[in-house]
């Protein structure tokens, strides 16, 4: 147990500890040489060490054969890890991919990349100046010895900048791109990093801590592009609540979608829910219920529902409806017995615009800070490009990295067929 505690003190400190003590980047040293009482790792690591000692001394009667499973069960009992998170991480560990982290010099992203590497989730590639990254890593007591660092502005990357620029200029020639303009853009982390994925030098890309979403969205459209069968792409957040898991879209991309864009969002949402091995039961939301208000947004939602039901007659989807009717099966069945969702628990909520979707998930997050939220999960781009935001924690980024890894693996399998 003593050795386990000593080892923990030298490892990167979880965000929850920094938050509780109102400090940034707590590291081993004169002011921190034993883990803080709130450190969630104490239960799993010290308990495992005590159990091992008990086995070695002959005190324990029941041997533990799978120590990782034992730690996972402890984390689940303590609420540190849900079945959803564990399933994502376990799947990613089976098929680790090369993931580019755009803001390699950011302490949060750097810690997330190292954690994802240590957990076997991915092979990280950090973008940034190597000297700066190593200084930050040294301050945080992080080991970057087996992690690739790419400086997109360095002289030795001139060849790749030219290669990526040529591809982008040819791809967007009818949209005003010249080679010179494309080459200049390759000094930017998002253009270079996404081009690495586009050209096969990496499998997935994580960005968003430094960049406005609007700028990142434009780069993604330019470099990666939207899948041919869609007019747009979108994002989804997964909320793991006491009532169950809910999938919410579109939380990031489309501000004022028309009925065609809403239809695309619904299609993408259904596919994404199936990606997580769930059967989608979808409610398309508005302030109106099944035609009670025939003005404004309810009309476009109603048209999108009609298109979805026509194209996918076996899909459980209906609307337009208010969110309370979507979430209350008994209320919905009593008031609207004709609904295609009769007797079903809704798990997928498609909102009529960005303000309502984004506000809804952030409201739930604010009311229940302990709730597990995974996202934003990108839907509809040609490659696995995924986003974070300036408020993302280390665990948030690790979770979205696991999603990106699975996304990349599934994409490879599809391309092999």
Model-predicted regions and their roles:
Residues 2-47, 54-57, 390-392, 400, ...:
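Adenosine-phosphate binding glycine-rich loop
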Residues 45, 49, 359-362:
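Short amphipathic alpha-helical segments
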Residues 58-65, 70-343, 347-417:
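Anion-binding alpha/beta catalytic cores of soluble intermediary-metabolism enzymes, centered on
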